[in-house]
Amino acid sequence: MSLFAAIGYMVREVFVFVSYVKNNAFPQPLSSDDERKYLELMEQGDAQARNLLIEHNLRLVAHIVKKFENTGEDAEDLISIGTIGLIKAIESYSAGKGTKLATYAARCIENEILMHLRVLKKTKKDVSLHDPIGQDKEGNEISLIDILKSESEDVIDMIQLSMELEKIKEYIDILDEREKEVIVKRFGLGLDKEKTQREIAKALGISRSYVSRIEKRALMKMFHEFVRAEKEKKAKE
């Protein structure tokens, strides 16, 4: 899978979870035993367990977004950002640190939204899902919401049109050294071929599931920077 495709699929995944929040379709919270079980399964690389942990904690996003209602920001944008914070929380949580998952996730969601608001204040430009961020193959303007709602593989083409290959380096440079190493190896940037997560894990002496978490975190950072840069560029036009 190309780097563009990976980012595209991640965007779509976020949108799926956002739809739960917007429609107030929250599964019941997990019991302590079930939560512990799914955390253990996720550590072993079980993607379904990861998704269940996210879905059963989505009510936290709705609860925390309400705290920011007086900011005047688009609620849909805040839900999207909060959902990204929840995904990061689930993927980085460590039960051994003694903090409850819900407490840790709530903190991550709030921090993600606060960081988003700081960026808006710095650029003095609202970042809305409905603002144009590029053009499709026919020259029509597309917005982030168009990408999120796409039901076809065109979602990958849309992102690739705006995020050209020569721009990759500037997005890579926002990553820390470990994230950069994983992304470069995973997508064969400057190398002969792409590496699997298992191959990278062996080379770095870490677990495959940890490589997966680093990869997702790095892709999310790059996507955030992509959207921020596009909005900043539009503000200057």
Swiss-Prot record:
DNA-binding region: 197-206
Keyword set includes Transmembrane helix: no
UniProt protein name: RNA polymerase sigma-28 factor
One GO term (biological process): sporulation resulting in formation of a cellular spore
General function of this protein: Sigma factors are initiation factors that promote the attachment of RNA polymerase to specific initiation sites and are then released. This sigma factor directs the transcription of crystal protein genes, a sporulation-regulated event.
Residue numbers covered by the propeptide annotation in the UniProt entry: 1-19
One of the record's GO molecular function terms: DNA binding
Organismal lineage: Bacteria, Bacillati, Bacillota, Bacilli, Bacillales
UniProt keywords, alphabetically: DNA-binding, Sigma factor, Sporulation, Transcription, Transcription regulation
Gene from which the chain derives: sigK
NCBIfam families: PRK05803.1, sigma70-ECF, spore_sigmaK
Post-translational modification: Proteolytically cleaved in the N-terminus probably by a SpoIIGA homolog to yield the active peptide.
Motif placement: Polymerase core binding: 77-90
Pfam families registered for this protein in UniProt: Sigma70_r2, Sigma70_r4
Family: Belongs to the sigma-70 factor family.
